[in-house]
Amino acid sequence: MLSTLACVARYLSGKEPGSGFWRVERESNGSEKIAIWDASLGPMPTQVEIDAAALPAVKAYRIPFNRAECSRRIFERYPAGRQLSALAGLYDSANVATMTDWIAACIAAENTAADAIEAATTVQAVEAVTVAWPV
């Protein structure tokens, strides 16, 4: 998961981590700084710009991150072929119900987390949101 400053750099630059356009490094005291900011992105963001972008940047990162994790969990447990077979009626209703209930629970857990992230008013509140994935 990206740090807050990395989320901000991604948000402000429109470039993904590892693209070579920017890099966040941890200093010896544990704080982070933007170590590389490509000139094609414009001037390096000021601390005021970083602070202003922190909340929307973290929200813009965490919601899709959780959605991707939801999809990963669903397809890991129930690959597309198995889901299609269930849809085609090749599994008994008890197995289909178990599968659809679990998938629905995953989606509901992710949606609950997304709602909490959207409602958050601080970066700390966003970072405190966890997804209660079904087992």
Regions found by a protein language model. Give the residues of each.
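A preference for well-ordered globular domain cores
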Residues: M1-V135
